[in-house]
């Protein structure tokens, strides 16, 4: 089992430093209708930057994606919805400031066309979706020593991130699964640790 220790507010496992206090004290439950009503939606307030590889993956299923977003196609041609700068690309937004790949389904829920397209062709959505979208509201950065610090975005005031009661001291499974995407599925000790213990805050 991987060695786990607590350093200030951070849980240390290998080269990863997880902001335990932030992640334990908040709950994440995606509710697009609530976010749209509040005008604070991740699909609107953030600019999504992707790598060339991520862009190519999206382009490879653009024919399916365009079934969900008619604005992606002009005649028989697909629009260029990526802005390039220094070998990084930013996904365009619509006139309403939402991501160009966002759409509303029949029930009025805001959805990601990339995610929906991947499911339609029976592929893993997280292979095609931008990495920053897959892990949000969890964020991370690497310092000069190649240590990875994992935090929660608590600054954007998006309504799907809620403060938990003070007596709740376990991390939500939804957030834990996102952390495992960053760390890699082979690191199972973190999942087992949270299942077996109420880790002290």
Model regions and ranges:
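Short loop/turn segments that flank or connect secondary-structure elements
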Residues: 1-201
């Amino acid at each position: 089992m991987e060695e786990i220790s607590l350093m200030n507010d951070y849980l240390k496992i290998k080269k990863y430093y997880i902001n335990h206090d932030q992640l334990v004290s908040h709950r994440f439950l995606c509710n697009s209708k609530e976010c749209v009503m509040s005008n604070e939606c991740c699909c609107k307030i953030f600019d999504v930057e992707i790598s060339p590889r991520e862009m190519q993956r999206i382009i490879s299923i653009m024919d399916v994606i365009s079934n969900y977003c008619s604005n992606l196609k002009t005649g028989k041609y697909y629009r260029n919805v990526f802005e390039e700068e220094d070998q990084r690309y930013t996904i365009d937004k619509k006139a309403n400031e939402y991501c160009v790949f966002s759409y509303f389904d029949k029930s009025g829920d805001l959805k990601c066309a990339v995610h929906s397209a991947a499911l339609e062709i029976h592929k893993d959505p997280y292979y095609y979706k931008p990495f920053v979208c897959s892990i949000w509201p969890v964020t991370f950065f690497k310092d000069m020593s190649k240590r990875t610090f994992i935090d929660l975005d608590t600054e954007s005031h998006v309504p799907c991130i809620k403060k938990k009661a003070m007596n709740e001291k376990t991390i939500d499974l939804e957030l834990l699964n996102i952390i495992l995407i960053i760390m890699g599925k082979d690191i199972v000790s973190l999942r087992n640790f949270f299942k077996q213990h109420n880790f002290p805050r």
